[in-house]
């Protein structure tokens, strides 16, 4: 059993792509979160530590990083839960992102892929005259609703092996968003969107490891969104045949 | 230390699926060449088949049958996830697929392969 | 191109689901009955149904295996691009040729 009065040993990644782990000792407190720990280090021990957070309450996703091998929101991760049977807390930046410094990563690639997958709403040419009635219980709306709570935290992108193996792969977040828009009956951009997700770096690369679904803090299931895109891709391919 | 995302059943399923597929793809040309020996009459094939009675070869044959059954079961799981609306209970489903593969292997063993 | 490969992979998988089940059942039956190669050939010799079924099996494999290999090689090795596609097309033809030859050999044995 760990001595709960002893300070917590925390290994923190310092540097960028190349670097090292630096160990800090942090006083334990009841119910402390990993974000509490990182903040303590930066404020009281080493002001040069770079990390991100914003809301502190599990709404923005800014604090995502890899904690003892699992990508998590640090504000919503209790130290006790993160440690499990381990005695040392290990903090790393999100995997599959370029590290800016220490625990802060460059999110540009992630959002570029979002755009490349056409993960944005395309209105019709005459919105005012085109008022859409969308029954909330319709299958398409339910499919869209299942994925729209994504806040772009990047955890699924970090967890995805295919993103690691093929850096061009659009990734679970971008594809999940694309699927919500495919199911949005008001959207007019589906031709370009289906082209984007059917291309070489698109939905077919998903091998259903399901790490994205496993680690999504919002409980979303990009695996099934991507499965929907695969079905749509096939339907389109068949429909095009003479 | 194995990464947390690699200790999930979905990853194990994908890895087994991939490795069994690789083994089968590499084995197939040899399988076809061996069978093709029959074209040259019974003798060349029989002398080749004598080689296959060695225990190591028999083990490899058994492993390939298990690989085939497992690859198919896990592949059907992928197709089910892609086509069917039901939500996969990953761990249980993967265990079932691997179990099916091993069951085929067991059947082969019990029937005097 | 990609959607076509994906569809070919899934369709060939559906065909293989049937063919592999047939093949596994045959293997287990043959082992159970203690059949030798000669015993098997006595059943396949001149058997047109066998030739057709296994011919379809070979065709499905020649489509399915190279596409699967393509993913593995692209993701686990630095090899990609046209060179890889050409090599895999060649592998597909190899499987087709050797496979049909094998089916024929067993048909004529």
Task: Name the predicted role of every residue range.
Chain C
Residues 1-109:
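Membrane-embedded alpha-helical bundles that constitute the cytochrome b-like, heme-associated redox core
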């Amino acid at each position: 059993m760990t001595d709960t009065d002893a300070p917590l040993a925390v290994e923190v990644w310092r540097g960028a792509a190349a670097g090292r782990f630096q160990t800090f000792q942090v006083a334990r407190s009841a119910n402390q979160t990993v974000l509490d720990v990182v903040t303590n280090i930066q404020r009281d021990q080493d002001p040069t530590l770079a990390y991100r957070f914003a809301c502190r309450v599990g709404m923005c996703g800014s604090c995502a990083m890899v904690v003892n091998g699992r990508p998590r929101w640090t504000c919503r991760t209790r130290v006790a839960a993160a440690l499990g049977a381990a005695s040392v807390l290990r903090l790393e930046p999100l995997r599959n992102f370029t590290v800016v410094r220490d625990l802060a990563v460059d999110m540009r690639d992630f959002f570029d892929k979002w755009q490349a997958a056409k993960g944005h709403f395309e209105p019709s040419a005459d919105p005012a005259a085109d008022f859409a009635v969308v029954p909330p219980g319709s299958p398409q709306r339910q499919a869209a609703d299942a994925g729209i709570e994504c806040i772009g935290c990047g955890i699924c992108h970090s967890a995805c092996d295919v993103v690691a193996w093929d850096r061009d792969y659009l990734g679970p977040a971008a594809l999940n968003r694309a699927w919500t828009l495919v199911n949005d009956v008001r959207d007019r951009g589906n031709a370009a969107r289906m082209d984007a997700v059917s291309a070489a770096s698109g939905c077919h690369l998903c091998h259903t490891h399901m790490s994205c679904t496993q680690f999504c803090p919002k409980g979303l299931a990009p695996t099934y969104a991507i499965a929907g895109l695969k079905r749509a891709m096939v339907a389109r391919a068949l429909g095009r045949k003479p | 230390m194995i990464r947390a995302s690699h200790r999930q059943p979905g990853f194990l399923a994908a890895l087994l699926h991939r490795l069994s597929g690789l083994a089968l793809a590499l084995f197939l040309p040899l399988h076809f060449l061996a069978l093709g020996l029959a074209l040259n009459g019974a003798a060349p094939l029989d002398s080749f088949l004598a080689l296959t009675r060695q225990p190591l070869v028999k083990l490899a044959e058994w492993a390939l049958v298990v690989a085939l059954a497992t690859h198919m079961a896990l592949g059907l799981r992928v197709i089910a996830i892609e086509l069917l609306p039901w939500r996969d209970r990953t761990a249980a489903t993967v265990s079932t697929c691997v179990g099916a593969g091993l069951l085929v292997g067991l059947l082969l063993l019990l029937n005097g392969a | 191109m990609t959607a076509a490969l994906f569809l070919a992979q899934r369709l060939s998988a559906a065909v293989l689901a049937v063919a592999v089940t047939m093949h596994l059942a045959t293997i287990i039956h043959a082992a159970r009955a203690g059949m030798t190669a000669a015993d098997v050939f006595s059943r396949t010799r001149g058997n047109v149904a066998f030739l057709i079924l296994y011919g379809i099996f070979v065709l499905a494999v020649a489509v399915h295996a190279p596409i699967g290999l393509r993913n593995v090689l692209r993701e686990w090795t630095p090899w990609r691009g046209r060179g890889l596609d050409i090599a895999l097309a060649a592998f597909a033809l190899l499987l087709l040729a050797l496979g049909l030859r094998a089916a024929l050999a067993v048909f004529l044995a």
